[in-house]
Regions:
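Acidic-residue sensor for enzyme active/binding pockets
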Residues: 6-8, 43-46, 189-190, 208
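Juxtamembrane low-complexity tails/linkers enriched in Ser/Thr-Pro and polybasic
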Residues: 44-60
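Low-complexity, intrinsically disordered tandem-repeat tracts enriched in small/polar residues
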Residues: 29-35, 42-49, 395-398, 415-420
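Intrinsic structural disorder/low-complexity segments
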Residues: 15, 21, 35, 43-44, ...
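N-terminal targeting leaders characterized by basic, low-complexity, disordered sequences
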Residues: 1-41
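Alpha-helical segments embedded in low-complexity/disordered contexts
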Residues: 11-15, 19-22, 47-50, 63-67, ...
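Catalytic-core signature of thiol
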Residues: 64-65, 72-422
Length: 422
């Protein structure tokens, strides 16, 4: 065997070297391809992750749970901001009497405001405590029977024809929500005086209603109908026997014996302004309660009309209605033709027009919708007779109608005549 030459050996070495280089190149390409594939996979994974993140973020935003609580949170923030922006001064920091407020009001209104002794040193919180009259359902109360359809005059004032039976305006205690008691006691006393031949006026005790009527809360307020029921059942002592104190600690006194008490016969409810006016014309003042707006506290004169955006108290205040009228358009009261009610208040003669106020009709202040008539024995008897007359007239009319229906028809037509001839 002939040995390989040196050239052959070198050629083989070169061939092996080239093969190694080729394998290395192939391996390098494989590594590069693998790296590219990994990079591509990483990019694809990253893009998928981004898409998934965006999708998850969108789904989170539309999740009803987060939407609900997010909405509630926004509403809460809105309420807090609005409360902060519209913070109101507490009522116990706002005085009833304010000269600056009076000046602003009086410069642009037909009715005027002013100071009065009753509200000196008082705040709107104090006033709110006095508006404590409440109302029960009227479904079980007697409706007044108002006879007659006589024309209601344009104006009427019970004070003009019954001056001898007019009590002075009550000045109730500033701390006592007893307007319902003072209105009932003074109304009954005046009506009894108006009915009497000698026109003798005997003031009656409002304090008895405040101290002795357990169905109400005394100086903390009460129901007008409860006080009227007490007055009918138990009667009222005279003011001389049980004088007005208007305090929370005033005790019920047994010193005023039953024979000394005055009782009305009953009471009834008047519905609507026409019935209220006819009752006042015939029998005297009536008792009602009104919604009170803050600007009414400082009323001085003119025809009161509640202001725009003026707050009102949540309770009611009891008053007496004594008449009505129409503004004549004088210089001081230029609201010509404006119809109004005349009411008697219980804040003293220094308030309003000597304790009275003119209130524009149709303001929905509640008192003109219905009122109470305190019925004396004489008034009750007159009402009974009126009802009997009405029932008798209705019965006679029904009988007459029945007789008319029973009369045979004597006006025969031609067919009837022909049918009767043989």
């Amino acid at each position: 065997m002939i040995g390989k030459s040196e050239e052959e050996i070198n050629a083989q070495k070169e061939l092996k070297k080239q093969e190694k280089i080729k394998k290395k190149e192939e391996r390098r390409k494989e590594i590069q391809e693998a790296a590219k594939r990994r990079n591509h996979q990483a990019e694809a994974a990253e893009e998928a992750a981004l898409k998934l993140g965006r999708k998850n973020k969108k789904e989170w935003f539309l999740n009803p749970y987060y939407l609900t609580f997010g909405g509630l949170f926004l509403v809460l923030i809105y309420i807090i901001v609005m409360l902060f922006m519209n913070r109101q001064t507490p009522l116990n920091k706002i005085p009833v009497l304010d000269e600056t407020r009076f000046f602003e009001h009086n410069s642009g209104s037909n009715w005027k405001q002013s100071d009065c002794k009753f509200w000196e040193g008082q705040t709107l919180a104090d006033a709110k405590r006095l508006m404590s009259t409440s109302f029960a359902s009227h479904s079980n109360l007697n409706k007044c029977f108002i006879e007659g359809s006589e024309e209601i005059p344009e104006s009427f004032d019970i004070r003009e024809n019954n001056k001898e039976c007019k009590l002075g305006v009550v000045d109730q205690n500033k701390k006592c929500a007893g307007s319902y008691a003072t209105a009932i006691a003074s109304t009954l006393a005046e009506k009894l005086c108006m009915e009497s031949d000698e026109k003798k006026l005997t003031p009656l005790s409002a304090q008895e209603l405040l101290s002795c009527d357990t169905a109400n809360k005394g100086c903390r307020g009460g129901y007008v109908n409860n006080a009227l029921e007490y007055t009918v059942l138990r009667g009222l002592a005279t003011e001389e026997c049980l004088p007005f104190k208007g305090t929370f600690d005033a005790k019920c006194s047994e010193m005023c014996a039953e024979p000394m008490k005055v009782r009305p016969e009953s009471f009834c409810v008047l519905f609507g302004d026409n019935d209220i006016k006819r009752e006042i014309m015939k029998n005297g003042p009536v008792v009602s309660s009104m919604e009170v707006y803050t600007d009414f506290l400082s009323y001085q004169k003119g025809v009161y009309t509640k202001g725009e955006d003026v707050p009102k108290f949540s309770g009611f205040h009891t008053i007496k209605i004594v008449g009505w009228g129409v503004e004549d358009g004088s210089e001081d009261e230029p609201n010509k033709g404006n119809k109004y009610w005349i009411i008697e208040n219980s804040w003293g003669e220094d308030w309003g027009e000597n304790g009275y106020a003119k209130i524009s009709e149709g303001q929905n202040l509640f008192f003109e919708q219905y009122a109470y008539s305190i019925m004396t024995k004489k008034q009750t008897e007159e009402m009974r007779q009126s009802i009997e007359r009405k029932q008798k007239a209705a019965a006679e009319a029904q009988q007459q109608q029945q007789k008319t229906n029973d009369v045979p028809d004597m006006n025969l037509d031609d067919d009837d005549v022909n049918n009767k001839n043989p």
